[in-house]
Amino acid sequence: MKPEIQSSLEYYSDLIEHMDDSHIYSLIFQANSIREKYKGKKIELCAIVNAKSGLCSEDCAFCAQSSRYKTNSPVYSLLEKDEIVKKALEAKKYGVKRFSIVISGKKPSKKELEKIGNSIEAIKKIGIYPCASLGLLEYDEICYLRDKGLERLHCNIETSERFFSNICTTHKFSDKVKTLENANKTGLSICSGGVFGIGESWDDRKEMAEFLKNLNVDSIPINFLTPIKGTPLESKKPLNPMEALRIIILFRLILPDKDIRVCGGRPLLGEFASWIFIAGANALMTGNYLTTTGRHYSDDIKFIEAHGLEVDSVVS
């Protein structure tokens, strides 16, 4: 890494961590200016379908879908293509640009991968970008999905490499990185971010931003922990709104030209929810999340337009 890049990472991270809330406005101004420079007034929307839920073999401490924890998460096998496409059509109707098939588990079986490929092919035909979040995939599996029309592969690194073992022991940070590198080799766009408020430090956040910058990801999902009863993190105190905004600012300043996408946990922002845009976010996940309820598409569109911004719904 170039010395000047390392220097800016440390400078911004230290500044954001230690700055008093009353002095955060200068950073917000800077983050907003960078967002407008690279992204203009466009806000990109994505939506997901929880296409296979529950009974996951992995032990991610924040996740309700792990078979190791007793939660109220729904359990069902892979949805049929028609049901997935129906949900994609609903999202497209409201100007959502990207639609992702998300499944529980370490990775899909060969039969599941084939069915997902057929669903991707159908989604592509309706004029919305097909994305997928399918766990840990090999190069040839990603090539198959790309050839079916997949545009972007998602695989969250979740946190920094040094903190990762505190939240997951059934697979390694390097396993996720391998999946993302495989996707890069195929020419696919890649999406990777994580969950915040899981016990990580500001150094972990800085390291994570640095790693994603080096990996040259296109989209960074920012999720704020929603503690779920039955998981190891059920007693974690949610982040306060100002700290959540600082995280968005950090990622915008370190990854100025990338999509900073606010996803799960938005309700914790409360009356500061509208500040996500001036803090640097240029993308949102809309609709429901995997195991928690989100906002309806129409509500998010009104939310965006109320701030003088517009939905980026153009699919080239």
Curated annotation (Swiss-Prot):
Which cofactors go with this protein?
A: [4Fe-4S] cluster; [2Fe-2S] cluster
An annotated Gene Ontology molecular function: iron ion binding
Q: Which UniProt keywords apply?
A: 2Fe-2S, 4Fe-4S, Biotin biosynthesis, Iron, Iron-sulfur, Metal-binding, S-adenosyl-L-methionine, Transferase
Q: Which GO terms describe its biological process?
A: biotin biosynthetic process
**Annotated pathway, please?**
Cofactor biosynthesis; biotin biosynthesis; biotin from 7,8-diaminononanoate: step 2/2
Instruction: Report what the protein is called.
Output: Biotin synthase
Chain ranges of the Radical SAM core domain: 38-266
Enzyme Commission designation:
2.8.1.6
Judged by the first EC level, this protein's enzyme class is transferase
Indicate the quaternary assembly: Homodimer.
Similarity-based family: Belongs to the radical SAM superfamily. Biotin synthase family.
At the top level of its lineage, which domain of life is listed? Answer: Bacteria
Co-factor: note: Binds 1 [4Fe-4S] cluster. The cluster is coordinated with 3 cysteines and an exchangeable S-adenosyl-L-methionine. Binds 1 [2Fe-2S] cluster. The cluster is coordinated with 3 cysteines and 1 arginine.
Q: What does this protein do?
A: Catalyzes the conversion of dethiobiotin (DTB) to biotin by the insertion of a sulfur atom into dethiobiotin via a radical-based mechanism.
What InterPro entries does the entry give? Answer: Aldolase_TIM (IPR013785), BATS_dom (IPR010722), Biotin_synth/BioAB (IPR002684), Biotin_synthase (IPR024177), Elp3/MiaA/NifB-like_rSAM (IPR006638), rSAM (IPR007197)
Catalytic activity, as annotated: (4R,5S)-dethiobiotin + (sulfur carrier)-SH + 2 reduced [2Fe-2S]-[ferredoxin] + 2 S-adenosyl-L-methionine = (sulfur carrier)-H + biotin + 2 5'-deoxyadenosine + 2 L-methionine + 2 oxidized [2Fe-2S]-[ferredoxin]
The entry marks the following residues as binding [2Fe-2S] cluster, namely: 100, 131, 191, 261
A Pfam family name for this chain?
A: BATS
Residues engaged in binding [4Fe-4S] cluster: 56, 60, 63
